Amino acid sequence: QNKQAAETFYQAMMGDDAVAAFEVGRDDLTEGYQMLADFKIASDKANSGDKQAAEDLYLALSKNDDIAPLYRDLARLLAARNVPNSRTADDVIAMLVPLTQGSGPFQGLALEAAAGADVQAGRIEAAKEKLGQIEQLADISAPLRQRSVELKKILGER
């Protein structure tokens, strides 16, 4: 079954319409490939402007206990980065709380996204505080650290 799942996944990804192919061939996929297909479908929805569908798919992934916590956290982060216009900054920040207040590989990116939501809501000091928290994290990439420093400068902190 793994070989068939791999072949189905590969053919869908190489085709002209991966989303349609995944919907038709979903039963041929193993759980892992189904998860990857769901991420691809959500990404395509986001890229086509259907933010509501993308958010719904990412949130469903984030709540799926059958997939590893790392992927659930990634789905939560992507849901927050692809919210429809009807969502408020507070909605985004609330969505990110499990990532911003916990430790993990997405904490810095979640803090950055939450800071962006604060800026959108006009809460510049709260945004600068979150950006400062990023700089205190030990395990973040140099580009994320640099973005945090630059964003704080743009927001008026030297």
Region spans (language model):
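Extracytoplasmic/periplasmic/luminal assembly and interaction segments
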Residues: M13-P69
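Soluble extracytoplasmic domains of inner/organellar membrane proteins
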Residues: K45-K51, E55-R158
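Alpha-helical tetratricopeptide repeat
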Residues: N2-A12, M35-A42, D73, L77, ...
